[in-house]
Every structure is written in C-alpha cells, then in structure tokens.
C-alpha cells in the first residue's frame, strides 16, 4: 500500500515501498553492514549483552534470532548505540506483528562527532524541555549537544560575582516588536543535571560563550568591558549583530572570562568550550586608544593580528583549566592554531574550508549552512527571514561531509553538526518542527558510509519512523505547508 510522506515543497509525496519491504529493517542512521537471514523474529528480548575487545569502543554487533537479540559492543559508546538500534527494531516489531527478519548488524559511526546545536541565547529553552530534545537525539545516535548560551539577545550562564548577567543580560524588553518581555537563565544545578542526563545517553554537552563579538547583552550588563562603554546599551530585541567587541586591553575582561571558564569547567566535563569567534567587526578596535597603543607596542600590523593575540590569550586561559577551544571558521586560518577545531558554516565555502583547514593543521566539523542550518525553512513559503533559502529534507540528506574527497584530503574532518538558530523559534515546539525530520538526514550523513546510503531507502524508513516517533515521543514529524506552529512575528526583517 502506498504510504504518504509530506516532506518536500509543501507537496504530499506518495510512494510504494518495494515488495520485500517487510524483509528490511527500518534503522536510522543506516548501519554500516546488515546481513539478513531467512528466519523471522517475533521477540526482541535481549538475551546477552557483552563487551568484546575485538570491536572498537564505539562499535557494536547486534544479532537478531528467533529467540531474541544478542548484543556485543566494544565499549560504553558501542553499547549505547547498539541499544539505540535495538530500540528502533522493537518499535518496528510493534508495528509488524508478523515479525521482522533475523540477521546480524555490524555497525560503527563514520565520524566521531555528530552534533546538534540549540540556541537558548535567542529564545530561552527550559532545561526540562531540552530533555525531550535530547531523547530524540539519542534515538538517532547523535553524540554532541551544543548550547549557544550567549549572544546579543541574551546571556544564559550564571557566573558567580557577576549578578547583572541575570538581572540585565538575561532579559530583553521584547522580540521583533511584539511587546512581550523575554528572559531566562539556567541555574548551575539545572545545567549539571542536563549534562548528567545527556551523559547517560552517550551525549557530551558543548557550551558556547561567543566572543569577542555577539556580546550586546554582556555590554548592557557590564559596559566597562568594552572599548567604548555605553551605559544606556540594551539587550538586543531583533536579529542581527552589533559592532561592539570586548576590549582585550582591559584586565577586568580577562578576570571575567577566567571566572566564566572556571564555571564551565565545574559544569561541563567535556572540557570543550566553543568560543564563537565569528562575525566580529574590528572597526572599534581600530579606533580604541587602548587597542591602538597595544598594537603599536607589540608591532601588530592590523586588527586581525590583534584578533589572533586575543584568541591565543583565551586559549591559554582555557589550557590552565585543561579545556580546549572551538570556533566558527571564518576562513582566516591565521587566527587559529594547529590542532584546534573549527566549524565550516559559511554558505558556499565548504570545499574551500576543507582545503584551507587541512593545510593549516586544523580539525574540521562540517556545519555548512546550506545543508545543516535547520532553522532555514524546509518547505517553500514557510516564514523566516526573506534571505533564507529553503533547505529541503533531500538537500540535507545529500550532504557528504567530505564532499567526495578521499581520506588523505579529508581525514581531518571530525564529523557533522547542525545548528538550529532560534531568533524566531520561541519554544520547543518550533524548535522540533524545524529540526525534524531533517535531523534524521543529518544523523545518517554523520554516521553511515556513503556506500550504504540511499535516498529512496531513507524515505521508506522515514515513513516508519514517523510512526515510531509518534508513539514513543508523542510527536508527529509530518511536514506540510499548513501544519507549521503559529508564527508570532509578521514582519520579515
């Protein structure tokens, strides 16, 4: 029977699964290797669960027999992924009382990094809501949750000794002229509980403290940290960036960031701190007397050399805590240091980023906006900014993080990452609507070798997964022109 799947361009897609569809597994992401057998399994009781040293730590082997399932894994990660696959097979079996085929699944991820980013800086997401998002991530074997905690529109991390982060930086008067105040800040305990919740599901949490730009909320709270303090600065109420950068010549700035990094160390055991580093116009550094004097003293030729010095000092602060930095890649490899990790995000620059980061000795995570930015509309006509192109499910699925390059040219690529920016996504419902089902495609891009991936097979599986997610998480992944959650802002700026 044909199964409807409304996913592209607002058009209801219908297709007929192949005749042997009942003799296939519906696993997303597609396993590395699947060997099906003639027998049928009507129970998936876990009969054995063993660690096998011959398997890699993130690999597993799941054997389905008529009597039940046997799991072998190389370590904790592999066991988590094997149990995730077993969970999906049980969901499939629940809808197929005639049974599913027996077989052997031998599996491991193509890339070690498979992440999603949420943006509570723009719209605060309560920690309790994030747990549902995390559960769905784990179902699809994602292993990194990136929290964009600070930006022009809000600051969400508490830092001892800096009370105005909560009283000023975490609040704004409205969003896009809607007249509705918005605020929110996590407690330290909430963040620790979220980290533990994620860890139990094989997910590390990566905090981001954006710098030296994207800091209008910080400027509103502590204007003395900036080159030209503006005591009347407000937390930004619209999208976009400001030209205000923290002043690297002020000791109080480094005292503040040392406190921030100490707090992150106590909360996030991953040891990774994303520092942003993107969209940082240096015109005020050029004009700042303190910065000009520092450049002259150090014989710096321009503000980009000052930017390099800024991040060298920041990296040194992190190193004292055993932490390492990550950045949004801006193409100027000179401000990064060999061995550091950057995210390729700028539209149309993926191939260039792969080549330049390889030459510079950097690790790369593929987050190319035309494939990976899940806040972009997924159906033509959905509301967002006018400049955003529609990124369909198939466009996301077409992503090869290596862009066809061989291992010797792309071996520094660590994985794939999909941000869900939230300037116009006010709550979990909007966040999930934009993230799924495209996150399923990103999951397969990060996990599955190109040789086992198939768009047609993915569409077949996704029809089943709509039912799996509906029953397990009470969430419908159907996407049509008319079922987008109500959109508060009518302007398109």
From Swiss-Prot:
InterPro entries: Beta_hexosaminidase_sua/sub (IPR025705), Glyco_hydro_20_cat (IPR015883), Glycoside_hydrolase_SF (IPR017853), Hex-like_dom2 (IPR029018), HEX_bac_N (IPR015882). It catalyses: Hydrolysis of terminal non-reducing N-acetyl-D-hexosamine residues in N-acetyl-beta-D-hexosaminides. Significantly inhibited by the addition of sodium dodecyl sulfate (SDS), but not by EDTA, urea, 2-mercaptoethanol or Triton X-100. Strongly inhibited by Cu2(+) ions, in case of which the activity is decreased by 70%. No significant inhibition with Al(3+), Fe(3+), Ca(2+), Cd(2+), Mg(2+), Mn(2+), Ni(2+) and Zn(2+) ions. Strongly inhibited by PugNAc (O-(2-acetamido-2-deoxy-D-glucopyranosylideneamino) N-phenylcarbamate) in the sub-micromolar concentration range. PugNAc at a concentration of 0.5 mM decreases the activity by 50% and the addition of 1 mM PugNAc fully inhibits the enzyme. One of its GO terms (biological process) is chitobiose catabolic process. CDD domains: GH20_chitobiase-like. Optimum pH is 5.0. The activity drops sharply below pH 4.5 and above pH 5.5. Pfam families: Glyco_hydro_20 (PF00728), Glyco_hydro_20b (PF02838). The keyword DNA-binding does not apply. Gene3D superfamilies: Chitobiase/beta-hexosaminidase domain 2-like, Glycosidases. The active site is at 151 (charge relay system), 214 (charge relay system), 279 (charge relay system). Optimum temperature is 37 degrees Celsius. Retains more than 90% of activity after 96 hours of incubation at 37 degrees Celsius and after 12 hours of incubation at 42 degrees Celsius. Zn(2+) binds at residues 227, 247, 288, 291. Belongs to the glycosyl hydrolase 20 family. This is Beta-hexosaminidase Amuc_2018.
């Amino acid at each position: 029977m044909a199964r409807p799947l409304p996913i592209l361009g607002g058009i209801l897609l219908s297709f007929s699964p192949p005749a042997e569809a009942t003799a296939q597994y519906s696993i997303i992401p597609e396993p590395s290797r699947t060997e099906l057998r003639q027998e049928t399994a009507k129970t998936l009781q876990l009969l054995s669960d063993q660690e096998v040293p011959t398997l890699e730590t993130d690999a597993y082997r799941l054997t389905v027999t008529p009597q039940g399932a046997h799991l072998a894994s190389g370590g904790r990660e592999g066991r988590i992924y094997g149990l995730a696959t077993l969970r999906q097979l049980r969901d499939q079996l629940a809808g197929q009382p005639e049974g599913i085929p027996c077989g052997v699944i031998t599996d491991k991820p193509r890339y070690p990094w498979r992440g999603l980013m949420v943006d509570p800086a723009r719209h605060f997401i309560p920690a309790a809501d994030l747990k549902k998002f995390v559960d769905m991530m784990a179902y699809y074997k994602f292993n990194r949750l990136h929290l964009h905690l600070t930006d022009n529109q809000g600051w969400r991390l508490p830092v001892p000794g800096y009370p105005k982060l909560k009283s000023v930086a975490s609040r704004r008067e409205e969003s896009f002229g809607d007249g509705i105040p918005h605020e929110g800040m996590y407690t330290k305990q909430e963040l620790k509980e979220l980290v533990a919740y994620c860890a139990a599901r094989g997910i590390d949490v990566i905090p981001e403290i954006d710098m030296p730009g994207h800091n209008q909320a910080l400027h509103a709270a502590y204007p003395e940290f900036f080159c030209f303090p503006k005591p009347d600065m407000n937390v930004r109420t619209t999208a976009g960036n400001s030209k205000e950068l923290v002043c690297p010549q002020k000791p109080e700035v480094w005292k503040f960031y040392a406190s921030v990094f100490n707090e992150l160390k106590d909360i996030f055991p991953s040891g990774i701190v994303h520092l942003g580093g993107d969209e940082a116009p240096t015109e005020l550094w050029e004009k700042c007397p303190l910065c000009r004097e520092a450049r002259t003293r150090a014989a710096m030729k321009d503000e980009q050399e000052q930017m390099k010095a800024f991040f060298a000092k920041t990296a040194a602060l992190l190193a004292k805590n055993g932490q390492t930095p990550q950045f949004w890649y801006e193409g100027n490899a000179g401000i990064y240091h060999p061995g550091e990790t950057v995210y390729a995000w700028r539209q149309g620059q993926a191939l260039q980023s792969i080549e330049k980061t390889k030459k510079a000795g950097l690790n790369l995570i593929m987050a190319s906006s035309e494939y990976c930015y899940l806040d972009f509309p997924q159906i033509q006509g959905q509301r967002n900014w006018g400049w955003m192109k529609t990124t369909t499910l198939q466009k996301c699925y077409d992503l090869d993080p290596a862009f066809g390059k061989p291992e010797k040219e792309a071996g520094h690529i660590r994985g794939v990452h999909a941000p869900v920016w939230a300037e116009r996504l006010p709550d979990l419902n909007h966040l999930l609507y934009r993230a799924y089902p495209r996150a399923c495609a990103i999951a397969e891009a990060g996990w599955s070798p190109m040789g086992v991936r198939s768009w047609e097979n993915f569409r077949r599986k996704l029809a089943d997964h709509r039912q799996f997610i509906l029953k397990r998480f009470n969430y419908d992944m159907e996407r049509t022109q008319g079922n987008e959650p109500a959109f508060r802002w009518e302007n398109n700026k």
